[in-house]
């Protein structure tokens, strides 16, 4: 029984550490950029869009498609950063599971 109690305590401790890491990640802002930084997207670690900035040079009513492509590029850049940070942050817990 003592072994099971220790496992439960370890699991609870890990859960608290994971929750703390998730909260820290959610509070972090990631900045994704398109080519030449013409579109910049800011997202939180929990993948909420905070801000999107367009350089004057990219705002052309006759070429909306380029603006759309650059926006997607900036968002995907930020999302990739979030995924990497999540793997790094949460991957640390994988080897610590008591079972």
Swiss-Prot record:
Signal peptide: none
Keyword Transferase in annotation: no
Pfam families: YbaB_DNA_bd
Subcellular location: Cytoplasm, Nucleoid
A single MF term (Gene Ontology): DNA binding
Cytoplasm keyword on record: yes
Keywords in alphabetical order: Cytoplasm, DNA-binding
Protein role: Binds to DNA and alters its conformation. May be involved in regulation of gene expression, nucleoid organization and DNA protection.
Protein family: Belongs to the YbaB/EbfC family.
NCBIfam families: DNA_YbaB_EbfC (TIGR00103)
Assembly mode: Homodimer.
Protein name: Nucleoid-associated protein stu1598
Biological source species: Streptococcus thermophilus (strain ATCC BAA-250 / LMG 18311)
């Amino acid at each position: 029984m003592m072994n099971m109690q220790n496992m439960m305590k370890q699991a609870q401790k890990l859960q608290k550490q994971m929750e703390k890491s998730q909260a820290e990640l959610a509070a972090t802002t990631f900045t994704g950029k398109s080519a030449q930084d013409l579109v910049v997207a800011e997202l939180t670690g929990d993948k909420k869009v905070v801000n999107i900035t367009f350089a004057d040079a990219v705002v052309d009513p006759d070429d909306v498609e380029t603006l759309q492509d650059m926006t997607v590029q900036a968002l995907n850049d930020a999302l990739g950063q979030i995924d990497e940070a999540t793997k790094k942050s949460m991957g640390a817990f994988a080897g610590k599971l008591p079972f």
